[in-house]
Amino acid sequence: PEGAGIWLRLHPEDVIASPYTSWTFDENTERMPEFSAPGIGKRSTKVVIDMEVKDNTSGVLFAMGGDGGGVTCFMENGKLFFEYNMLIIERYFSTEGQKIPAGKHTVELLTAIPKPGGPGTVTITLDGKPYSVCEIKRAVPAAFTASETFDVGKDLGGSVSMRYHEKAPYKFDGKINSVKVDLIKNK
């Protein structure tokens, strides 16, 4: 029926979602459909990345979605960044943190999105210490896209971020040991 395409925007509770609440990925994860992947960028989540970097490491740690909307966590010249592409309408960026020294590190991204389509905050820590923050004015209520995917260690398809669009798929040149994602139940 006419207008049926806006149903999920008005009723995000009807979105098809994975039954899982916890995932563990490695750098071989690619092209996982959004509706099967964790709800990163749409729900409250905790993402823990176990990685090894060299001086000036660059590349995508993970990306969900594409140029039409999505989220990405990436490194550029040794610094860590997070970007939230709200369907091209708005883009939200993390504050810039310090250069990360060579070695093994743990990055945690704690995303608080209390309700679909509402505002949110992504708090990023490095080895247990505050690193940067991304304030989201409006989160995507249902889905970023029906055709893009979740990737670890690269951003296949359309690039979530214009910062690395010309370098796509912007393969991570460090080592990703694991990316653990847990959904957080909102109160």
PLM regions: where:
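Extracellular glycan-associated modules
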Residues: P1-K187
